[in-house]
Design a protein with these regions (language model features):
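A short, Lys/Arg-enriched amphipathic alpha-helix followed by its capping loop at the start of a domain
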Residues: 2-4, 16-23, 208-211
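Ordered, amphipathic secondary-structure segments that act as subunit-interaction surfaces
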Residues: 74-91, 95-98
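Catalytic domains of carbohydrate-active enzymes, especially glycoside hydrolases
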Residues: 8-29, 82-83
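Conserved, mostly hydrophobic/aromatic
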Residues: 17, 79, 118, 142, ...
Length: 219
């Protein structure tokens, strides 16, 4: 069955996503930086506001460089202590390749938690070579658009990547409703939206009706 994952910034977003029928949340802060690690307080508020699974972003700066690994490990530990059981992460090295060492170092702090490797894959030198690396790192999901330019440009790559699962392919990054039938036909079962369920932009909350419209598209 297809799933819809919705980006949430706070409890209000989480409640609207659940009411609209979403299946999972990606919890982040600071979308101006493309999504950073949320505070412990925000995580607790969201966890208390919804029954949906919550994947929490582990990233401390815009882009796909590792940043402060010690800080990220501390944040991961603190989030786990607060009850987080699912995460989102993934890094590139200075040469544009998947940073296996840093990723595995942080994953070690998760101790078996489910996690998504996020769109660093799209920004790597070769998405197919990178997929082969990422699938050895222990994630159960890869968030990708197939291209750094977004889903519209990456449709061909996505159709090839979904055939190489596992891990599961979660499509997001400029995803629009008109992409859904073609992706479903190719075997994609995971869809990820953010601004698409915020008609008034990132400064406004998730709209329940928009989430419901997306969920209905997946049926």
């Amino acid at each position: 069955m297809p799933i819809l994952e919705v980006i949430a910034l706070n409890a209000k977003d989480a409640e609207a996503a659940q009411e609209g029928g979403a299946h999972r949340l990606e919890l982040v802060s600071d979308m101006a930086s493309d999504g950073l690690t949320p505070s412990i307080a925000t995580f607790k508020e969201v966890r208390n506001s919804t029954d949906l699974p919550i994947r929490v972003m582990l990233r401390d700066a815009k882009g796909f460089a590792p940043g402060n690994l010690k800080q990220l490990r501390r944040q991961a530990w603190e989030l786990r202590e607060a009850g987080a059981t699912e995460f989102v992460l993934g890094f590139l090295d200075a040469g544009g390749e998947i940073d296996e060492g840093v990723t595995l170092n942080l994953v070690a702090e998760l101790e078996g938690c489910a996690w998504t490797f996020h769109r660093a894959l799209d920004n790597s030198n070769d998405v197919f070579r990178s997929w082969g690396i990422v699938k050895t790192l222990g994630c159960d999901t890869v968030l990708a658009a197939g291209s750094p330019k977004g889903v519209e440009d990456g449709l061909g790559n996505l159709k090839e990547l979904v055939a190489q699962a596992p891990p599961a392919l979660l499509v997001g990054g400029g995803l629009q409703q008109h992409h859904v039938p073609e992706l479903l036909a190719a075997g994609v079962t995971g869809f990820h939206v953010g601004s698409a369920v915020r008609p008034a932009g990132w400064e406004s909350p998730v709209e329940m009706a928009s989430v419901r419209e997306w969920v209905n598209r997946l049926v």
